[in-house]
């Protein structure tokens, strides 16, 4: 209100309308973001958050998540710690960049989110080609793991590059349950 007091009357309408327009646009943008964009842990009707600690993860102490996600991450964490895989670098694919943070695993390529559109195929391919020893753990989502098991050509060029990398590194799937597939080099 105070900013409107000192505006001269002949210019007052323009200044007031611009301020109202900017504030209005901000509210509309915030509302639309809340309606159309949600975090993956948004709760379906009837579900509740539960407190969890995931094996092999110090960053999730006192974390709250859904029951299903707790089971998925708990099973994955158990497998990774049992096989001492959290000490290795990781390549993630399938919109799961947080796995690197949750299990404190260093990314094997330039990013933890290789499937993000702004991360280019050329950069991913260059990083994969540079890996010749000390092959990383590869973790993908259920859907991507099933697609990789199909031995087909892939529409997604980045996924095709990862499939070729898995073949070159003689990778085997050691874990395929509860939402994730984990591949390790033999």
Segments the model singles out, each with a brief description of its role:
Residues 24-185:
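Extracytoplasmic
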Residues 1-5:
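Membrane-embedded alpha-helical segments of integral membrane proteins
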Residues 7-25:
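Membrane-interfacial entry segments at the cytosolic side of transmembrane helices
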């Amino acid at each position: 209100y105070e900013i409107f007091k000192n505006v001269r009357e002949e210019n007052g309408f323009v200044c007031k309308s611009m301020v109202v327009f900017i504030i209005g646009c901000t509210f509309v943008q915030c509302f639309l973001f809340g309606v159309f964009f949600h975090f993956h842990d948004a709760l379906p009707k009837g579900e509740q958050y539960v407190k969890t600690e995931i094996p092999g993860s110090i960053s999730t102490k006192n974390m709250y998540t859904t029951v299903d996600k707790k089971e998925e991450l708990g099973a994955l964490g158990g497998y990774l710690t049992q096989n001492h895989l959290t000490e290795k670098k990781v390549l993630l694919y399938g919109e799961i960049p947080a796995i690197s943070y949750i299990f404190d695993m260093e990314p094997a390529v330039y990013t933890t989110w290789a499937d993000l559109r702004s991360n280019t195929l050329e950069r991913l391919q260059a990083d994969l080609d540079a890996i010749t020893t000390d092959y990383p753990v590869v973790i993908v989502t259920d859907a991507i793991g099933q697609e990789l098991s199909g031995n087909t050509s892939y529409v997604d060029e980045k996924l095709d590059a990862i499939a070729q990398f898995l073949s070159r590194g003689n990778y085997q799937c050691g874990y395929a349950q509860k939402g994730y597939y984990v591949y390790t080099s033999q």
